[in-house]
Amino acid sequence: MTQTSWRADPLVWGHGPRVFEVFLEPTCPFSVRAFGKLDALLAEAGPDRITIKLRLQSQPWHMYSGVVTRCVIAASTLGAGKEAAKAVLAAVAAHREEFEFDHHAGGPNMKATPNDIIARIEGYSGLKLGAAFAIPDLDREVKWHCKLARQNGIHVSPTFLIDGLVRPEISSGDKVSDWAAHLLAA
């Protein structure tokens, strides 16, 4: 196996026994809504009671999904690790329409290049991502997220799991208190 000089920081917050896995696509409006609730969930349920694991679910109908997802993973290799990745997710969420296509097929992003998208994310997040994005074997981490989703039958975002089991009754539209109740139920 090839030795690498980089490490993608796992996108994990909290250290409790109940595990809440969330598969998100960074430009999906429903994923953005779910992402915006994760800090509040950790605060309400308690980092000693739950663990949140963020998984990335790139989806081809979100046309620049692969580029944006790779930017998130690239950010996780920087000094700030998962917090840098979270900053990229927050920047994309705050400006979601600037990373998406009109009706998944048109609009201003038709003329955008991957470098334009990276520069846009850098501008909004305040992070320099170019070198990390260009790590030759960074796709290994991208593929890990993809394989994890596939082996678990994840097809849409967001998808929520509690202790490894898909929970289709949980929605991005739910209140944080409802998520906490699901997680903390005996």
Predicted regions: what they are:
Residues 2-18:
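A short beta-strand-turn-helix
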Residues 21-26, 32-118:
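Structural alpha/beta surface segment adjacent to cysteine/selenocysteine redox centers
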